[in-house]
Curated annotation (Swiss-Prot):
InterPro entries, A to Z: TVP18/Ca-channel_flower
Alphabetical keyword list: Calcium, Calcium channel, Calcium transport, Cell membrane, Cell projection, Cytoplasmic vesicle, Endocytosis, Endosome, Ion channel, Ion transport, Membrane, Synapse, Transmembrane, Transmembrane helix, Transport
Membrane topology recorded in Swiss-Prot or TrEMBL: Multi-pass membrane protein
Family: Belongs to the calcium channel flower family.
Lineage of origin: Eukaryota, Metazoa, Ecdysozoa, Arthropoda, Hexapoda
Name of the protein in question: Calcium channel flower
GO biological process terms held by the UniProt record: photoreceptor cell differentiation; synaptic vesicle endocytosis
Known partners and oligomeric status: Homomultimer. Associates with the dally/ magu complex.
Sequence intervals crossing the membrane: 34-54, 66-88, 117-137
Regulation: Channel activity is inhibited by La(3+), which reduces Ca(2+) influx and thus inhibits it's function in promoting activity-dependent bulk endocytosis (ADBE) in response to high stimuli.
Signal peptide location: none
Organism expressing this protein natively: Drosophila ananassae
Function (record text): Transmembrane protein which mediates synaptic endocytosis, fitness-based cell culling, neuronal culling, morphogen gradient scaling, and calcium transport. Regulates synaptic endocytosis and hence couples exo- with endocytosis. Controls two major modes of synaptic vesicle (SV) endocytosis in the synaptic boutons of neuromuscular junctions (NMJs); Ca(2+) channel-independent Clathrin-mediated endocytosis (CME) in response to mild stimulation, and Ca(2+) channel-dependent activity-dependent bulk endocytosis (ADBE) in response to strong stimulation.
PANTHER family: CALCIUM CHANNEL FLOWER HOMOLOG (PTHR13314:SF2)
Length: 195
């Protein structure tokens, strides 16, 4: 068993089916899950640090810390439901979110990560929520899908040039607008008070 198979076996859920959509590379699929778990852990940890800021009577950081901790718990619930075995419906919720398109999860993670950063800007909220935001960005990239092959892109480029009937110009002044007037420096405006 190779190292990659061991890692994918550790990060796979029990009874997990392959996604119906386009196949993602294994390192992106399981890397996003691993980043989500690490992001959730640090979001909870640094959210707790922001909650302790109530000692300095900073209510904005208290609320931001609570939101960041809730976001961390939600990400942990969706990425690693095995951490919440004491709650009955966790697997149902995780399966329901897994059945949604990837851009749903990307938008959810990015939307949950932004408010704590704006409410209490600091290293704790920036790092904790920033990792959740990075997880959302990776899920967004996975939602966009793979890039087309080089042959497909060449064929599409040739078709777009074939439809363009205008001749290509190589003149140095080809980008200049016709009948454009040069700038003129006429001096001071008539309403200038010379101050």
């Amino acid at each position: 068993m190779s190292f990659a198979e061991k890692i994918t076996g550790l990060l796979a859920r029990p009874n997990q089916q392959d996604p119906v959509g386009p196949e993602q590379p294994w390192y992106l699929k399981y890397g996003s899950r691993l980043l989500g778990i690490v992001a959730a852990f640090f979001a909870i940890l640094f959210g707790l640090w922001n909650v302790i800021s109530i000692l300095t009577l900073n209510v904005g950081c208290l609320v931001a810390g609570i939101i960041q901790m809730v976001a961390g718990f939600v990400v942990m619930l969706l990425e690693a439901p095995c951490c919440f075995v004491c709650i009955e419906k966790v697997n149902d919720i995780a399966d329901k979110v897994d059945s949604k398109p990837m851009y749903f999860r990307a938008g959810l993670y990015c939307a949950m990560a932004v408010p704590p950063i704006f409410m209490c800007f600091g290293l704790a909220s920036l790092f904790g929520s920033g990792l959740i935001f990075a997880t959302g960005v990776i899920y967004g990239m996975m939602a966009l899908g793979k890039k087309a092959s080089a042959e497909d892109m060449r064929a599409a480029a040739q078709q777009s040039y074939a439809g363009n009937a205008t001749p290509q110009t190589t003149n140095d002044r080809a980008g200049i607008v016709n009948n454009a007037q040069p700038f003129s420096f006429t001096g001071a405006v008539g309403t200038d008070s010379n101050v």
